[in-house]
Amino acid sequence: MPSIISDPQAYDIMLRLLQFSCWSLSYINTVRTTLSDQLPSVSFMSICCDVAWEFVYAFVYPIASSHWAGGIRIWFAMHCVMLFIVAKYAPNDWDHVPLMKRFARLAYVAITIGFMAGHLALASEIGPALGFFWSGALCQITASLGSLCLLVCRGSTRGASIKTCPLCWFYIAITLTLDAIYPVFFFYFRAIEHPKKDSERKVE
């Protein structure tokens, strides 16, 4: 009986289930931390970009996310709950900007619609399949950059749960480990594929 790793399809499904589980747990933890600190634990741009992306590829271009077997729709539902809770406490994050404090909830809606238009425009420009990937990459960048910006701008760990959440440490450890391993294997296989070219370059 072939192992999961030797079966590409089974391996792919296993990785998707792992990713789905980790992101879902991350969303649940975000809600828990927001309710606990009464302060958004996810960046403004990040959640708006995510909700917009999930709406576009769950309902407008579902075929582009069909390989997730409905997972995007589940994430969209979870994100809507998260957005409602985050928006509820959003004014607490804007005491230094009275105008934003007053219209924070409206801003969440407006920015989400703006990102939605952007995702749709990109999909129409390069196609839903590529749009799904590149828009998803943008979501990942805003999530990583947004979390850092929140921490630096606030100068406080309120709203952030890295110290108290073992799952966060696991996520950081596994992603950094995999990112560190990737270039090692990349250059290893590159050396095997192009030994002659590499040796010629060294001679030159």
Swiss-Prot record:
Entry EC no(s): 4.2.3.-
Coarse class of the protein's main subcellular location: membrane
Pfam families for this protein: Pyr4-TMTC
InterPro entries given in the database record: PaxB-like
Membrane topology value: Multi-pass membrane protein
Function per UniProt: Terpene cyclase; part of the gene cluster that mediates the biosynthesis of terretonin, a fungal meroterpenoid that acts as a mycotoxin. The first step of the pathway is the synthesis of 3,5-dimethylorsellinic acid (DMOA) by the polyketide synthase trt4. DMOA is then prenylated into farnesyl-DMOA by the polyprenyl transferase trt2. Methylation by the methyltransferase trt5 then leads to farnesyl-DMOA methyl ester which is further subject to epoxidation by the FAD-dependent monooxygenase trt8 to yield epoxyfarnesyl-DMOA methyl ester.
Name of this protein: Terpene cyclase trt1
Gene name tied to this protein: trt1
